[in-house]
Amino acid sequence: MANPQNRVQTERQQNNSSPYLRGDEVHDDPGIALSVFALQEIIRKVRESQTSLRNEGREVNPAPPEIEQIFSALRHLRDERPYRIERTLPTYYRFESSQSQERFFRVDSHFERIAAPVDNATLEEPARLMSLVSRRVDAIRDAGSFLLYNAPTHFVDGREIIDADGLGVDVSGPASPRRAEGASPATRQIDQLTVLNQDQEDTMVDTYPGACPDAVFRVHRALTAHVVHHQRDDYRNAMQWLQAYGEYKRIDFSRSLLTDVFSPDTVYIQSYHVPANPQLLWEVPRCGIPNLRAKRVLGVPHGTYITPNPRITSITIASRVTTTTSFAQLLGTIPTAAQMDDVRKIYLALMFPNQILLDIRSEPGHQVDVVAQSVAGVLGKLLFSYGPALFNITPHTPGPLIVHAPLSCKWQPMIRRTIRHGPSGRPLDFVITQGQRAFDCNQLAQNPARGNGYAGWGVDAVGDHPTPYPHVRRRIQYLGYVPEDVIDERFCGDDLRYPLHQTMCEALAISGHVNERNYVEMMRHDHVVRFAHLSQVINRDLVSALSLPDERFNMLAAVFPRDATGPDGPLVLDISYMAIIHAFRLRFLPVSRPERIIYQPMLESVYASHLSLAKLHANNLQTFVTANSESFVEARPLDTWRAVYPRLPEPVRQIFDLTGQHSFVTGSDIGLWLRSPLVQDSLFLLCARTAWQAVDDPADIGFTRDVYIHRQPIPGYPLEDVRQFRRDAVYFTNMLEARPANGNRVILDRAIMQQRAGAGRLRMSIRELLDDGLFVQIGIALRPNYFEHPSRLPPEETLRALPFEYRARARNGPTARVTLQMLRPVSAFFMLYNADEQAFPDEMIDLVPKMSLVSLYIQQPPVERVSYDTALSVINRDFVSFRSRVRLMDLSAAFDAGSQYALPSNAM
């Protein structure tokens, strides 16, 4: 069949089919086209209004920018691991060569890193000295927080031997082939360090000896033992809880990808324990409002504001082309941006009953709209709850609503109606009589004890239902309906009623507001479904560890009539009358689940874990301060918290700052919180708790109290036999081998030194004691020490540096003043003598011998003179290393509840 030919349209046909009207034809049209053009303009205006309403009604991300940043940082904090994977032991000991072929020196490299030089000015401020202690404890924790994996080995005579670079000792000195005399003993010792292949808890590991300081080894041993022996129970408990969490939140959680957790070739490392302890989150001082804001960000879903069926308005209050009823005038308006902000406040308060309350914003006299006030008075009663268990408005809000609600009942003119006022003069104390019918408006008066006059009247608004969190069992049931029973509009039916609705319809009908009564009746189903969605959001999406505990929630309702405000709130938001009208007409409909509901358990656990770390640091630091009060004479109660607070992670610190924005946190609040025994277990806490054991021996963190002033001449040795002098590896140090005998030691405590300094006789007193050859101990305070290893004689300021500062201050009057500061860092130095073969015998003799004024005692000195037989004596620890065929997997990324693609990440 041939293709038909295209017909050419005439000009008249083109005009008739044109989607737009042409200007000259409109001008010449007798009227029909003009009417169509006008109708198009009307439709365009209507569509613009609908588009504006839709844009305003689209709900944006409810998270404020600062809260959004906090939770983003918390999520990144989740990726931080409290451990690191090492193949070999870090180098803790190194060797310094000497001119001797038999002796050399072993230096504790870890002590060098810990005992770094500090500023003198920081020691007199207790908070800064506490910060120094915390930093050194953290350095021990970081040094010991490692797991060994795939240790390097080799075979000697069929035995598996650990490589020399995996021992924790830099053996390049004593085991070097250049030292022909001593290389053989050191090499033989290393060849005896056999690796044992073991099976611990169905995990393949290698056990071998190594060198490590005691404080660091304790942390490493505790971390390794926990990963090997205890992680599977933690994993099982976390999986069971996450399964229950997913079922409650109506999200799918699949652990099909984690089925090999009990495999001998896989080790899962769980840095954080799930779930978080809610009591720990709620014992933070004044945390009610910050937790409320955080909970809002975690659980409020994205949604939109929709209008009910337009036929409801058209067949009730807007059935005529022109109408003058108050409802018809207001329900046809478009909300402004400011009014939509108030609508969001209203729905936010409905999602957080008792915690967020609404108050009517006062308006200037020239802006008062009596019609809006009267309509808001009626609709506000249908929208808000005012007892007995739920409150959405403040005690001051019912006053304006009650004053204006009767206007709607009195404005409608009616011949056969009588209004009889009561004796009290209250706004609702009147009776409407119509024939034999009568309605007492006192039924609509508020009563917080029973909820009269508002949506919570005569309904069971709070039920009991178990949740994944033990501190929350309440189930909010606005209007008395279980949300799951009525939320599906297709099957819930049309007979959903509640007491206030029936009473309000009766009041509107008897007062002559028949159209308004019909509107409220037709809106009943939409209203019930509105609250069903809100109840579901509260009971499902908003339930978290940050939810207000049941007893505190009930306490807010109990103290509500007294208009009391406490640390838990309530938070008051102001709204306008027009916002109430628009909130009743617009229904909040969730369109997507909250984004953070998937990793909410991990965020809660991360936050609780770092709170526990802060408590651990503060409590242990306070114990250290109490045990060494001589070093912290001017310490104040909150100095420990001031030292710990700056070391908190940034997002945790920001949440604490949110607390200070709403309520003043006192020292008593902080003290009560720190004394609480509640903690959230984690690998961070395990390592930190073990690291704090180092302060039992202050030398482990580079502190000592055995500091003495004593004249110790630096010897000048005659070089009669240069070869023997070199062979002996002669050295000088101000570190004593033992404490001075009691008969040769004098202690000058702080009180004695202050007394003699005030009299201007401190130097004289110390000089007399030094002339007698005594060791003068300057107090019993702990002082930080640092290690120096100069290649030649230390400078004069190091040799003569005193552990205290005593100087006269400028005189501004007849009284002399002195400054006495007891705490100064002490240098522990070590100097090796080197002799040239062509040196004269008196090469090292000085006519005026140098003096070292300060001596100190360290139980385990950081430097020792050793031989080839004793060089490796520090290799006395047994280490466990995971074999290369074992996979180390971190579980932090796999604890995103509801994500079927949450895979454990490689820990290497």
From Swiss-Prot:
Pfam families tied to this protein: Orbi_VP3
Cystines in this chain: none
GO cellular component: viral inner capsid
Subcellular location: Virion
InterPro entries (alphabetical): Inner_layer_core_VP3_Orbivir (IPR002614), Inner_layer_core_VP3_Reovir (IPR016029)
Annotated spans, Disordered: 1-25
Family (UniProt): Belongs to the orbivirus VP3 family.
Protein name per Swiss-Prot or TrEMBL: Structural core protein VP2
